[in-house]
């Protein structure tokens, strides 16, 4: 019955217990009212006292067996059985006194039942040492109330026997008054007692046997130890003493407590929180902090109610101080996006508008990850306007753009000077030659002498997609020339040759190490590679054709010499990155048309796979002195020798394209002439070379070309 609290009331459950109580109390009351007075007179006054004591004992045990907790185990909470439920095996085995005893998993209570424990289907609880569920007491009989149930049976049997015996004695004494009321009530009580005596006496005898053998009704009925040994028995006397004399078992369920309502008087009220003392604890991506904000309680309540509907905070921004390359690329992307959205932005990509701000110190020239390697915008306005100032203030000028003059502002057109013989687009190098470890890994594998490599197809795609340069026009990414490029052994550069992409310090170190004498080799004739006119505009094609006509009219140069490494490798050396010295004034450069600013005479790169590969001259190879005048040469090239028997058209075709892989190499912080620092090239010319001719000296002829181009040729 204690388990019934809090559950739905079922009247049928109380019918047996109510009938038992009525018969017990009613029959005993009639016995004491009609039979005991006559027995006290006829037999002894102790008869009513004895029956009263036995009746009280029966009533006490009945009450204890009905209302006492039989030993119910509490059910597992939801957080306790998360790991065990739906994955636990049905049985677990434990060993008790050397005998294996199974423990069954209870799906209702969600735990393994201890030995001798069973789940009561009526009470819906697991009861320790479950015996049976008795409907006469409306309770389960378990470890905690089995003693009272057993004593109830014993006392009830004794009481029934007493009532029946003393009633029979009363009838025998009053045989003449069988028609009387007292004798009739006594005979009725005897019938009730006689009817209940048979089942109660039989049940009592059964439990006496179970107690003596140390078993429960459930174990006896199910036959768990029918063919084996009971591990729970301790002998007859010990079993009886354990049931009757042992201390009561502990209670596993707490007693229900009623909630107490306490009235709080004004002295015990909580103080009001002021608006300035509200402490808000925030959590921002794992960082907790306390902020004191001047907010009212109403605003905090509104914020709390809207917190469930608010969007999550944005992810934290990356730490740009830790990743130099990421910071550089983000800066480039932001600047390029802002430039593309401008009103005066040209339709072509604007990568030429960026140039690296190099420092004149050796540290910034040698370390590409320094802070001076950030790409700046607008520094070109500070460039020196004369060659003398540019030699004192070394810096790099950006590559020429193919944009029309109408799309460029006057300031921008003046800040980027054009070099007619500048080769290759370095827009990719301006954007990606600084700041990332991936590009440093490429710099270690790229050859500084300008030889092409087989793995520049992906970088060529970047050049095509990222910038519009002269190389991307001559050799598109889908050209088969990309597929046929093969890397060969790196030729030894000639004396006085300096890579145009090395820093000043590295160039000086390598210049001191290279002193091999030049060995003249025989020239090799080869047809020039045809120029691809597919991607060129009409004006550029006309300029190229005009220059080719001029080159065909010029006579071939007498004996040229090749550098020693090119005779065997079959790989042409790059004639520098196209920083030829400027001889015209800055005013002439600013007035030139966009067509003049496009490098002319840059045919497509020839295939390298043929055995009789193209072999051109190196930048530092000596040339004979004054030769017949020919067009298409600047004064920086007039002081060098050319291989004999090779026409100028072939020589122009020998100039290779600057591959995108070469664009990634580091550039020196000095203005260059023919790939060499101007100070070095002018101060110490190599053997077999003549000093550069000045435009003011004799022997220099100026020839006007297409579009107002002026060529200065040594005679």
Curated annotation (Swiss-Prot):
On this chain, the residues bearing Omega-N-methylarginine are: 617, 697
Q: What does this protein do?
A: Palmitoyltransferase that catalyzes the addition of palmitate onto various protein substrates such as CTNND2, CD36, GSDMD, NLRP3, NOD1, NOD2, STAT3 and S1PR1 thus plays a role in various biological processes including cell adhesion, inflammation, fatty acid uptake, bacterial sensing or cardiac functions. Plays an important role in the regulation of synapse efficacy by mediating palmitoylation of delta-catenin/CTNND2, thereby increasing synaptic delivery and surface stabilization of alpha-amino-3-hydroxy-5-methyl-4-isoxazole propionic acid receptors (AMPARs).
Write out the topological domains of type Extracellular.
Answer: 35-38, 170-191
What is known about its processing and modification? Phosphorylation regulates association with endocytic proteins and its subcellular localization. Phosphorylation by LYN during fatty acid uptake leads to inactivation of the activity.
Instruction: Name the encoding gene, please.
Output: ZDHHC5
Per the record, residues carrying Phosphoserine are: 247, 296, 299, 345, 380, 398, 406, 409, 415, 425, 429, 432, 529, 554, 621, 684, 694
Which molecular function terms from Gene Ontology are attached?
A: palmitoyltransferase activity; protein-cysteine S-palmitoyltransferase activity
Enzyme class name: transferase
Q: Please report the name of this protein according to its UniProt entry.
A: Palmitoyltransferase ZDHHC5
Domain DHHC residue range list: 104-154
Task: Name its cellular compartments.
Answer: Cell membrane
Q: Pfam families attached here?
A: DHHC (PF01529)
Q: Could you list this entry's UniProt keywords, alphabetically sorted.
A: Acyltransferase, Cell membrane, Immunity, Innate immunity, Lipid transport, Lipoprotein, Membrane, Methylation, Palmitate, Phosphoprotein, Transferase, Transmembrane, Transmembrane helix, Transport
Residue ranges, Cytoplasmic side: 1-13, 60-148, 213-715
- Family to which the UniProt record says this protein belongs: Belongs to the DHHC palmitoyltransferase family. ERF2/ZDHHC9 subfamily.
Q: Which GO terms describe its biological process?
A: innate immune response; lipid transport; positive regulation of NLRP3 inflammasome complex assembly; positive regulation of pattern recognition receptor signaling pathway; positive regulation of protein localization to phagocytic vesicle; positive regulation of protein localization to plasma membrane; positive regulation of pyroptotic inflammatory response; protein localization to plasma membrane
According to the UniProt entry, which residues carry Phosphothreonine?
303, 348, 350, 411, 436, 659
Record membrane topology: Multi-pass membrane protein
On whether S-adenosyl-L-methionine is a keyword of this UniProt record, the answer is: no
Reaction catalysis annotation:
L-cysteinyl-[protein] + hexadecanoyl-CoA = S-hexadecanoyl-L-cysteinyl-[protein] + CoA
Q: What is known of its domains?
A: The DHHC domain is required for palmitoyltransferase activity.
Q: Where is the active site?
A: 134
Q: In the record, which positions carry Phosphotyrosine?
A: 91
Q: Which InterPro entries match?
A: Palmitoyltrfase_DHHC
- What does the record give as EC number? 2.3.1.225
The membrane spanning regions, by residue number, are 14-34, 39-59, 149-169, 192-212
């Amino acid at each position: 019955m204690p388990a019934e609290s809090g559950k739905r009331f079922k009247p049928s459950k109380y019918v047996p217990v109510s009938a038992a109580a009525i018969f017990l109390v009613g029959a005993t009351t009639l016995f004491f009212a009609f039979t005991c007075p006559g027995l006290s007179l006829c037999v002894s006054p102790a008869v009513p006292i004895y029956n009263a004591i036995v009746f009280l004992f029966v009533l006490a045990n009945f009450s204890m067996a009905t209302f006492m907790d039989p030993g119910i185990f509490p059910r597992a909470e939801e957080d306790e059985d998360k790991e065990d439920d739906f994955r636990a095996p049905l049985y677990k085995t434990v060993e008790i006194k050397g005998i294996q005893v199974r423990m069954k998993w209870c799906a209702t209570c969600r735990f393994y039942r201890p030995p001798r424990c069973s789940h009561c289907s009526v009470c819906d609880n697991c009861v320790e040492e479950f015996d049976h569920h008795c409907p006469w007491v409306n309770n389960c009989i378990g470890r905690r109330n089995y003693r009272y149930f057993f004593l109830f049976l014993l006392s009830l049997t004794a009481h029934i026997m007493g009532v029946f015996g003393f009633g029979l004695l009363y009838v025998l004494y009053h045989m003449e008054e069988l028609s009387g009321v007292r004798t009739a009530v006594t005979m009725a009580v005897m019938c009730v007692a006689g009817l209940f005596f048979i089942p109660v006496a039989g049940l009592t005898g059964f439990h006496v046997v179970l107690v003596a053998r140390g078993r429960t009704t459930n174990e006896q009925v199910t036959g768990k130890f029918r063919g084996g040994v009971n591990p729970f028995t301790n002998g007859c006397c010990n079993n009886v003493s354990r049931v009757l004399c042992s201390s009561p078992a502990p209670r596993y369920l707490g007693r229900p407590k009623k909630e107490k309502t306490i009235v709080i008087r004004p002295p015990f009220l909580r103080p009001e929180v002021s608006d300035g003392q509200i402490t808000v604890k925030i959590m921002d991506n794992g960082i907790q902090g306390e902020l004191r904000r001047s907010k009212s309680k109403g605003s905090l309540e509104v914020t709390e109610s809207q917190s469930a509907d608010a969007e999550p905070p944005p992810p934290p921004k990356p730490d740009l101080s830790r990743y130099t390359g990421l910071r550089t690329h983000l800066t480039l992307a932001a600047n390029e996006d802002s430039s593309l959205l401008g009103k005066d932005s040209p339709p072509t990509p604007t990568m030429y508008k960026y140039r690296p701000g190099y420092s004149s110190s050796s540290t910034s020239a040698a370390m590409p990850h320094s802070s001076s390697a950030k790409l700046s915008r607008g520094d070109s306005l500070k460039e020196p306007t004369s060659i003398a100032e540019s030699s004192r203030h070394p810096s790099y000028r950006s590559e020429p753009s193919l944009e029309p003059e109408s799309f460029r502002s006057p300031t921008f057109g003046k800040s980027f000077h054009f070099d007619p013989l500048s080769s290759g687009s370095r827009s990719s190098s301006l954007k990606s030659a600084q700041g990332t470890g991936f590009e440093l890994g490429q710099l270690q594998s790229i050859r500084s002498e300008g030889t092409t490599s087989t793995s520049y197809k992906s970088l060529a795609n970047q050049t095509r997609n990222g910038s519009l340069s002269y190389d991307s026009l001559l050799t598109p990414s889908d050209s088969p020339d990309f597929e046929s490029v093969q890397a060969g052994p790196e030729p030894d550069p000639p004396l006085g040759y300096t890579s145009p992409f090395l820093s000043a310090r590295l160039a000086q170190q390598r210049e001191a190490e290279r002193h091999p004498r030049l060995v003249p080799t025989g020239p090799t004739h080869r047809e020039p590679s045809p120029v691809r006119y597919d991607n060129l505009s009409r004006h550029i094609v006309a300029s190229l054709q005009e220059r080719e006509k001029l080159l065909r009219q010029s006579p071939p140069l007498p004996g040229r010499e090749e550098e020693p490494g090119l005779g065997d490798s079959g790989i042409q050396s790059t004639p520098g990155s196209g920083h030829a010295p400027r001889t015209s004034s800055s005013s002439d450069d600013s007035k030139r048309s966009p067509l003049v600013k496009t490098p002319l005479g840059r045919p497509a790169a020839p295939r390298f796979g043929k055995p009789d590969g193209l072999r051109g001259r190196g930048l530092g190879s000596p040339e004979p002195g004054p030769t017949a005048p020919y067009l298409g040469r600047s004064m920086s090239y007039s002081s060098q020798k050319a291989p004999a028997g090779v026409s100028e058209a072939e020589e122009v075709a020998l100039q290779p394209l600057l591959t995108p892989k070469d664009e990634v190499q580091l550039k020196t912080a000095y203005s260059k002439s023919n790939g060499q620092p101007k100070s070095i090239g002018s101060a110490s010319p190599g053997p077999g070379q003549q000093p550069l001719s000045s435009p003011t000296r004799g022997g220099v002829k100026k020839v006007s070309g297409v579009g107002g181009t002026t060529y200065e040729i040594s005679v």
